[in-house]
Amino acid sequence: GDILSRIFDKPLAIMSTSSYRADAGTVQGHLDIARYITTPQGEIAGKVLLVDDLADSGHTLKAVIHLLKNNYSPITELRSAVIWTKGLSAFTPDYSVEFLPTNPWIHQPFEGYDNLSPDKLLEKWKV
């Protein structure tokens, strides 16, 4: 979302969600959606593009779109964009860079932190 915000010179709003925390982020658990959306410029209104990295199961994107449509009436148009859409996804985004007909594991740069604790970090960087 940050890159598209910069390219199109549009304000960025951030909504935090979490569901993949069990087994180093490989098992989907309870979906948590933040109560508030952070944005530096006014309210969420007009045309909105919801951006995520991946439509995996599709449950998170479906839930967020439902929440936005029901709680943000100033939104007049809502579209979605992702980098990857898996074939098993229950949600089809409006825009997707790559469709993955199978269910491959997408290696994300933040995965290395899933099993990292402060103690492990101190041990790793101990001099």
PLM region descriptions:
Residues 1-127:
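PRPP-associated nucleotide enzymes
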